[in-house]
Amino acid sequence: MPAERPSVSQKPKNPYKRPDAFTKAAKAQGYPARSVFKLEEIDRRVRLLRPGQRVLDLGAAPGSWSMYAAQRIGAGGKLLAVDLSPITAAFGPQATVVQGDALSLTNEALAQFAPYDVVLSDMAPATSGSKIADQARSYELFMRAVAVAEALLAPGGAFVGKIFMSEDFVKARDALRNLCEEVRSIRPEGTRASSVEIFLVGLKRKAAGKTG
């Protein structure tokens, strides 16, 4: 069953309070993390996921995005979930889990179900305490995800990638515009007030050879 978001009235007055309404709702619905509601909102707003699709999820641990995507694509779809950390969540027979670093895995290793209809990246750096360093690392992860999408995303396909807001945001957005016909920036309702993250969504991947 797709994730059911908590109502706005359920959100705590203190945005730093833990667990908040999204955390509680995720746990109640069997998802490992509240991040599921970010993907649910993006999916709802751009009609991202459909039955039978092939999906690549980069930075999949602890597994909420992959669980949601597996439900949406159904038994006729295919899902490859990749993360450096172990993933113990159950996604169903349509899913395969690869434990590895998305920055170092070859495109061939990620191509089990390619070409993909959707490439997802919720990858984020382990924060270091240095804002500049964390932003640079986030940009690097985002650009790696875009490079994977360039190699493995089917024409007409969609991309979702997380990035920390910084002076590199425009470069990241332009790189995705070079790949997709339409690009949107979305900050889901479930994002904590203190977070600097935003999601860039690319729709209608351009045909091979068509850029700019």
From Swiss-Prot:
<dbReference type="InterPro" id="IPR050082">
    <property type="entry name" value="RNA_methyltr_RlmE"/>
</dbReference>
<dbReference type="GO" id="GO:0005737">
    <property type="term" value="C:cytoplasm"/>
</dbReference>
<feature type="binding site">
    <location>
        <position position="122"/>
    </location>
    <ligand>
        <name>S-adenosyl-L-methionine</name>
    </ligand>
</feature>
<keyword id="KW-0949">S-adenosyl-L-methionine</keyword>
<dbReference type="InterPro" id="IPR029063">
    <property type="entry name" value="SAM-dependent_MTases_sf"/>
</dbReference>
<protein>
    <recommendedName>
        <fullName>Ribosomal RNA large subunit methyltransferase E</fullName>
        <ecNumber>2.1.1.166</ecNumber>
    </recommendedName>
</protein>
<feature type="active site" description="Proton acceptor">
    <location>
        <position position="162"/>
    </location>
</feature>
<feature type="binding site">
    <location>
        <position position="101"/>
    </location>
    <ligand>
        <name>S-adenosyl-L-methionine</name>
    </ligand>
</feature>
<feature type="binding site">
    <location>
        <position position="83"/>
    </location>
    <ligand>
        <name>S-adenosyl-L-methionine</name>
    </ligand>
</feature>
<dbReference type="GO" id="GO:0008650">
    <property type="term" value="F:rRNA (uridine-2'-O-)-methyltransferase activity"/>
</dbReference>
<feature type="binding site">
    <location>
        <position position="63"/>
    </location>
    <ligand>
        <name>S-adenosyl-L-methionine</name>
    </ligand>
</feature>
<keyword id="KW-0808">Transferase</keyword>
<dbReference type="InterPro" id="IPR015507">
    <property type="entry name" value="rRNA-MeTfrase_E"/>
</dbReference>
<comment type="similarity">
    <text>Belongs to the class I-like SAM-binding methyltransferase superfamily. RNA methyltransferase RlmE family.</text>
</comment>
<comment type="function">
    <text>Specifically methylates the uridine in position 2552 of 23S rRNA at the 2'-O position of the ribose in the fully assembled 50S ribosomal subunit.</text>
</comment>
<keyword id="KW-0698">rRNA processing</keyword>
<keyword id="KW-0963">Cytoplasm</keyword>
<dbReference type="InterPro" id="IPR002877">
    <property type="entry name" value="RNA_MeTrfase_FtsJ_dom"/>
</dbReference>
<feature type="binding site">
    <location>
        <position position="65"/>
    </location>
    <ligand>
        <name>S-adenosyl-L-methionine</name>
    </ligand>
</feature>
<keyword id="KW-0489">Methyltransferase</keyword>
<feature type="region of interest" description="Disordered">
    <location>
        <begin position="1"/>
        <end position="26"/>
    </location>
</feature>
<dbReference type="Pfam" id="PF01728">
    <property type="entry name" value="FtsJ"/>
</dbReference>
